[in-house]
Every structure is written in structure tokens, then in C-alpha cells.
Amino acid sequence: MKVLFAGGGTGGHLYPGVAMAAELKKRVPGISISFAGTSAGIEATEVPRLGYRLVLFPVRGLKRGLSIRALVENALILGDFAKSLSMAMALVRKEQPDVVVGTGGYVSAPLLLAAQLSGKKTLIQEQNAFPGVTTRLLARMATEVHLSFEESRKFFGGKSEVFVTGNPAREFPAESRESCLDFFGLDRSLPTLLVFGGSRGARAINNAVLKLCHRLEGTVNLIWQTGALDADRMRGEIGTSATRWIGPYIQEMGKAYGAADLVLCRAGASSLAELTNLGKPSVLIPYPYAAADHQRHNAMALVSAGASVMIDDSKIGEEASFDVILTLLRDREKLAQMGEAARREGHPGAAATLAERIIALSKS
């Protein structure tokens, strides 16, 4: 059995494919798995590190604007797409994959299109509540489309082969709240706020939490992933405390979630998959410059479900926003209700479910 994954650029587009690949290896001895990506994406280093074959394509995203420079650049980019499509057609003819799986990013388009034109089975896995243009166009000819949010279904008309299976996410062993708090050296009797803005941090969130710290002191535990760029500045400005853990990156993310009563973070698809799988209430601050504002759509899906509160990036540093966060932290009943709502939106085992669908398609 041969499977080709096409996706990357960011971890959000790569790691769902990696999770599916791992599940396929468990189920199909001797399976051949390859990835298609670009030299500029995270896959250029991660895929070889994980031991998978990587085929690189020159495809890039179009530039916005109508300037002469943008028009010239876009003409070159369209040329790269045509070259990538030709390369993809040749790869599909040579490799004869049983299924091509698209997980988003620029490289998905030429690979999925080449597979569809060659009569191969294709599966699209969409992470976000607001599907991208490529997904919406190629879904028409895809064998199956798998979504992370029920709200996304409306973008695919009457297509019957559309399923809500969730977004493959990291899985963490179950641990007691007390043992997780002990790991970070925090007070078991206090509510705990977990803050992160991605592996590199988020400046707006960090600056807001820096202002919020004086209101948390002595009444709320704080576990704060600042990202590497802000770690020293944040530590230097607020110093140490028995109720704070501050670091550039949280290696033991499962323990951080286990300790947390409330999570403050961006609204990326992977983070939301983890929050819902674990049943964690959240305050979401969508990244305002995400493509097609997709993080706001992601956040609204959880807000509508009663699992989250959304605060605009431009308002996160206001006292009124701090009031919302502190009010939630003091209301255990509300947090429990939000946590249950989050859990109802979760799809634990999404990677395994998708692996089974890929196997079924290869046999059909």
C-alpha cells in the first residue's frame, strides 16, 4: 500500500499528516509513505527527521496587491505552480499511490489536482472552521473530505462524501491535577491559568499577561509559555513568584493542560483540537492576520458551543478583558460547564479514524 501526503508550510498543516502516517504504520506493515512539501516549510526539516521520504516542489502562494512588483511576482508564481503540477503528474504516474491525502498548504493544490486528473483516490483533511479556497475547489472532485468542525459542512454544498472526523492532535496521558501542579511547583489550592501563544509566543498576549500579573498574584497560579523572544524580558519585569511558572517553551504540555483550570491562547486548529479532546475551557484570542481570518471562525465555533470566550487581539490588554478572565477563574461551576461543552466538540482518536478511512479507500 502506498500513501502520499501533501501539505505543510506550517505545523498546523503538517502534523495532522504525520499523525495519520503514524497510525497507518501501526495498521499496515510494510506500507510506503511519502510526503510532498516545499523547501521553505517546516516539513523540509521535520519530515526527514521523522524518517519519511520528502519530495520538494517549487509552489508558492500568490502575492496580494496590484503593484507592478506584485503582478510580476505572481506571474512567476503561476509559472512555479505549472511546473509543480507537471512534477506532481510525473510523481503520481511513477509512484502510483493508492491514496493521496491533502492536509493544506500551497503544495496540496498541485498534488491533489494531479491525483484527481490521474484517477487516484484523494482525501482532503481540513483543519479550520473556514475552509481555504483550495480545499473548497478541489473538494468537488475529492473522493472524501474530512472536516474538523460541523460548521464547515455548509461550504461543501450537497456533497455526500463529507465527514466531521476532527483534527488529529497530540495525545497526552491522563494525570491528576495535583501531580501536574506539583510538577510546576504551584499551589494546589488555587485556580490555574495556562497561557501560550504558540512555540514562538505572541507579543500581544505576552504584553497583556504582563499587565495582568499584578491582579493574579497570590490568588491564581500562572503557567506561561512566553516563546523564546520574550522569555527573558517577561522574567526580568515581573521576577519570580511561588504562584508562577514562566518559560520560553513548555516541554511537558500534557502536565500543563492537566494543571490548568482555564487556558488563554490563540485559536489555531491544533490548539483547539487539544482543548476539546481534553475538555478544557478557554479564552481565545484569534490571530488577526491569519489567512481569511480563519482563527476567528475557529474561535466562534467553540464560542457558539459554549466552550470558550473570545477576546479581540486589540482588546486583550484592557482591564475589562482581565475582568472576564478573572471572573471565569473564580467560577468553578461555569468552568465545569465550559469544559463539558469543549469535550462534546472533541474528536479523540481522529488520526486513527482517518487512517482507517485511508485504508478503506485504498481497497475500494
UniProtKB/Swiss-Prot annotation:
Print the keywords alphabetically: Cell cycle, Cell division, Cell inner membrane, Cell membrane, Cell shape, Cell wall biogenesis/degradation, Glycosyltransferase, Membrane, Peptidoglycan synthesis, Transferase
Which terms does the record give in the GO molecular function aspect?
UDP-N-acetyl-D-glucosamine:N-acetylmuramoyl-L-alanyl-D-glutamyl-meso-2,6-diaminopimelyl-D-alanyl-D-alanine-diphosphoundecaprenol 4-beta-N-acetylglucosaminlytransferase activity; undecaprenyldiphospho-muramoylpentapeptide beta-N-acetylglucosaminyltransferase activity
Q: What is its main location?
A: membrane
Q: Which residues are listed for UDP-N-acetyl-alpha-D-glucosamine binding in this entry?
A: 10-12, 128, 170, 199, 250, 295
The record's EC number reads 2.4.1.227
Cellular compartments annotated:
Cell inner membrane
Q: In its keyword annotation, does this UniProt entry include Cytoplasm? A: no
Q: What's this protein's family per the entry?
A: Belongs to the glycosyltransferase 28 family. MurG subfamily.
Function of the molecule? Cell wall formation. Catalyzes the transfer of a GlcNAc subunit on undecaprenyl-pyrophosphoryl-MurNAc-pentapeptide (lipid intermediate I) to form undecaprenyl-pyrophosphoryl-MurNAc-(pentapeptide)GlcNAc (lipid intermediate II).
PANTHER family (UniProt xref): GLYCOSYLTRANSFERASE (PTHR21015:SF22), UDP-N-ACETYLGLUCOSAMINE--N-ACETYLMURAMYL-(PENTAPEPTIDE) PYROPHOSPHORYL-UNDECAPRENOL N-ACETYLGLUCOSAMINE TRANSFERASE 1 (PTHR21015)
The name under which this protein is listed is UDP-N-acetylglucosamine--N-acetylmuramyl-(pentapeptide) pyrophosphoryl-undecaprenol N-acetylglucosamine transferase
Species per Swiss-Prot/TrEMBL record: Chlorobaculum tepidum (strain ATCC 49652 / DSM 12025 / NBRC 103806 / TLS) (Chlorobium tepidum)
Q: What does UniProt list as this organism's lineage?
A: Bacteria, Pseudomonadati, Chlorobiota, Chlorobiia, Chlorobiales
- Gene expressing this chain: murG
